[in-house]
């Protein structure tokens, strides 16, 4: 069982590293954030099932709901930015360019 936890933590660290490396593209950042949320969901589910915490069974579902809301808002932002500017570079976007 510890190898599963190690793999999930490694997946989270890889997604975090991907967020840091690909921070200039909005789509890549959103994909890495989704990977982080998926690994957090899996890790919290496994911890709750292994510890037999019956009061916390709803926590992973709540995390999954917030991840879906984050994905919907991120995709709406991506569509808005790509329709307005024609690209998804975060560095080129500035409020001073009006």
Curated annotation (Swiss-Prot):
Top-tier EC class: translocase
Highest rank taxon of the organism: Eukaryota
TM annotation in the entry: 2-22, 29-49, 61-81
GO molecular function, one term: NADH dehydrogenase (ubiquinone) activity
Keywords: Electron transport, Membrane, Mitochondrion, Mitochondrion inner membrane, NAD, Respiratory chain, Translocase, Transmembrane, Transmembrane helix, Transport, Ubiquinone
Assembly and interaction partners: Core subunit of respiratory chain NADH dehydrogenase (Complex I) which is composed of 45 different subunits.
Family: Belongs to the complex I subunit 4L family.
Protein name (database record): NADH-ubiquinone oxidoreductase chain 4L
Gene, per the UniProt record: MT-ND4L
């Amino acid at each position: 069982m510890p190898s599963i936890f190690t793999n999930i933590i490694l997946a989270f660290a890889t997604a975090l590293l991907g967020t840091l490396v690909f921070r200039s593209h909005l789509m890549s950042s959103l994909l890495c954030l989704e990977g982080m949320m998926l690994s957090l969901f899996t890790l919290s589910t496994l911890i709750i099932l292994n510890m037999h915490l019956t009061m916390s069974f709803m926590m992973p579902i709540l995390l999954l709901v917030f991840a879906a809301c984050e994905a919907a808002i991120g995709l709406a932002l991506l569509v808005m930015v790509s329709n307005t500017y024609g690209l998804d570079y975060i560095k080129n976007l500035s409020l001073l360019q009006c």
